[in-house]
Amino acid sequence: MAAAAEQQQQQQQQGFRPLDEASLVAYIKATPALAARLGGSLDALTIKEVGDGNLNFVYIVLSDAGSVVIKQALPYIRCVGDSWPMTRERAYFEASALQKHRGLCPDHVPEVYHFDRAMSLIGMRYIEPPHIILRKGLIAGVEYPLLAEHMADYMAKTLFFTSLLYNSTTDHKKGVAQYCDNVEMCRLTEQVVFSDPYMLAKYNRCTSPFLDNDAAAVREDAELKLEIAELKSMFIERAQALLHGDLHTGSIMVTPDSTQVIDPEFAFYGPMGYDIGAFLGNLILAYFSQDGHADQANDRKAYKKWILKTIEDSWNLFHKKFVELWNKHKDGNGEAYLPPIYNSSELLCLAQKKYMTSLFHDSLGFGSAKMIRRIVGIAHVEDFESIEDASKRASCERRALNCAKAILKGRRQFESIGQVIVHVQSFDRD
Amino acid sequence: MAAAAEQQQQQQQQGFRPLDEASLVAYIKATPALAARLGGSLDALTIKEVGDGNLNFVYIVLSDAGSVVIKQALPYIRCVGDSWPMTRERAYFEASALQKHRGLCPDHVPEVYHFDRAMSLIGMRYIEPPHIILRKGLIAGVEYPLLAEHMADYMAKTLFFTSLLYNSTTDHKKGVAQYCDNVEMCRLTEQVVFSDPYMLAKYNRCTSPFLDNDAAAVREDAELKLEIAELKSMFIERAQALLHGDLHTGSIMVTPDSTQVIDPEFAFYGPMGYDIGAFLGNLILAYFSQDGHADQANDRKAYKKWILKTIEDSWNLFHKKFVELWNKHKDGNGEAYLPPIYNSSELLCLAQKKYMTSLFHDSLGFGSAKMIRRIVGIAHVEDFESIEDASKRASCERRALNCAKAILKGRRQFESIGQVIVHVQSFDRD
């Protein structure tokens, strides 16, 4: 088996070649599943490379009759100048997760037209303008009235339907085994989310000198380090559902009517709270960045209220939809809560309450960990980075950091998302 | 890959034939790894079948010059008359776990001489007399002065060295993926430990009519059902270490000087507390059964004290050895607690305390679940079954059941094993 896997890997290495525009056209012509999406004539394609070139090539390919996006993984990622070797097999997990999640939630996951494992190449739906990356919309101060509803729908469906609440243990463990191989991506997360921010690490950075002491305080905070250890273990050990694995506001494309979740190359079976927390935590970051984007034309006060409302609605709608799915499928294949045991609506309701409370606290923990790492770790967010005045940026970041630290430490005290909102607002003063 | 696996499975089915004594001799002669253990002449072997014939054939094979045990898995298990189909692949996981655990703890795990996957056949060390099954020794009232020390050693080494405290995430996930395939055995555990005792199930039984109401009370105990759901999820989702998976007192062979752990066919990556709890819980069952074995010659009072002492020592020594291993290997490959983060002995000590407290509570939870299922579930223990007077047996069982229920519900309140011992004693009155 090991030998077979090795051989397969070698073949894949042999079959791999990074595409440029010319070879891309040839590739499309030779691939019916892609050619068909672009219509008959493939001689007048418009091709635009939109990847940042550091992780993947991303080509938008347009013809008179159609469009596709071609995403090809490169065998490394590049951060802060250096490149880290990184398996191209992440494309396989990205394609697998897109296909699985689209099957569960077609409204919010783009279609995969074609996957070529040897080439680490995904051909998928072009998510057309006016879709933009949600993070950019949040920076611009654009309201998305359906965002909470859509993301609640996406999270409830992808998490519920890949958990033991819906699947037999046999099916669940098959999925777990499959995604164990995406371990390189999990290790990257471990390092940048759960380790580096809490130690002196080469690539850590912060808005210096303003936040130097804040970053040092994170590295010296025993209570924080005890909490992060627990979350890190849970992240690796607990195969609760098939996660997106990187569900921040840069992995979501939006218009006022549409929400599309992309880029699940970190997909693995992990704790549900990691996905939920990523989304909520990044909304809280967006909230704290708003003062840095306020100007005379727009003080962003109304927009901040909308963000808070979106955070609150996202959790509450997720909760509602998730429990609805649970009730709807309680007599299905899932073996976690067998009807003959949880045999009254009162008891099932108690079990659900316990489950959801635990999930809520996990989400708050992971969400605050994701916030912290964006302020004192390697990868920062454009929400703050785009605030040019470093002093103002640092002030926004500090409030977010202090808020996150308090949530991480005290997460088990929160009984509702409303209480979290009040907590967030309490940090929103200079 | 799926096709390859299927083909392999078919070949294995083709290669499988249950051995009888005659074909066993031929098999041994044709297998150098076994023949060598028995010395030159293989024509005067003494063969004894000691398996119960329901799960596996177990042959003891003796020659003038040596000995082996041959264990062959059958494609079903038989319980209460009916047979359940059960993959013979459990032999593969048993052999793998024996080999892995023996590498980590050679003093307490027998050597595997030979494994034949197609035949589901393990050739291993014959654990010679005066070794007996620990459970039988406990029923006979025999003290094993080194038992706690040996089992603490076994549990500390097998659990620590297969956890993220010692291994990289990459190695850990490889192991997790491998053992995901032993899912049929996990499902059996799920059913008989975490489900059936809490519902009306065909094979449940209890010492009737004495315990009928007690069994019904378990099925109607909402608090108990909420706790068992949490443990069940943890059992399936949490890949903390490579467990034995069935570490009761029937899986341990002892003399006063030697302790050998056998039969890990339920091995999988699960929560450490499941193994620890199985051992401690079965000792508590043995404790509560003693009054049923008392007679004029031996009131078993001193023996009961020895059992309690063994429970206390087992946990305390396990705790000591486990933390010692952690300290010894804290600068190794394990990535869960990186030295640059947990960078003072005080902080590491706090982290260990938190980890061990959580593990203690898990162990109490799983241990009490294992006790409950042995009283109102399908598979009972000889400790109680061998008490002929049903009324007396029921009285012993009821005290064990009530003790277990209270531990399961209140496990997070216990701060030391000493408190648990006091709690156990408090149920030891008629």
Swiss-Prot record, chains A, B:
Keyword entries, A-Z: Amino-acid biosynthesis, ATP-binding, Kinase, Methionine biosynthesis, Nucleotide-binding, Transferase
Induction conditions: By sulfur starvation.
Pfam families cross-referenced by the UniProt entry: APH
Root EC class: transferase
SUPFAM superfamilies, A to Z: Protein kinase-like (PK-like)
Recorded metabolic or biological pathway in which this protein acts: Amino-acid biosynthesis; L-methionine biosynthesis via salvage pathway; S-methyl-5-thio-alpha-D-ribose 1-phosphate from S-methyl-5'-thioadenosine (hydrolase route): step 2/2
EC number(s) per entry: 2.7.1.100
Presence of the UniProt keyword Translocase in the record: no
Molecular function in Gene Ontology: ATP binding; S-methyl-5-thioribose kinase activity
Binding residue positions for ATP: 52-56, 71, 125-127, 263-265
Domain of life: Eukaryota
Catalysed reactions, semicolon-separated: 5-(methylsulfanyl)-D-ribose + ATP = 5-(methylsulfanyl)-alpha-D-ribose 1-phosphate + ADP + H(+)
InterPro entries, A to Z: Aminoglycoside_PTrfase, Kinase-like_dom_sf, Methylthioribose_kinase
Keyword Transport part of the UniProt annotation: no
Signal peptide: none
Residues bound to substrate: 56, 246, 373
Gene Ontology BP annotations: L-methionine salvage from methylthioadenosine
NCBIfam families: MTRK (TIGR01767)
Quaternary organization: Homodimer.
UniProt family annotation: Belongs to the methylthioribose kinase family.
Function: Catalyzes the phosphorylation of methylthioribose into methylthioribose-1-phosphate.
Protein name: Methylthioribose kinase 1
Species whose genome carries this gene: Oryza sativa subsp. japonica (Rice)
Lineage of origin: Eukaryota, Viridiplantae, Streptophyta, Embryophyta, Tracheophyta
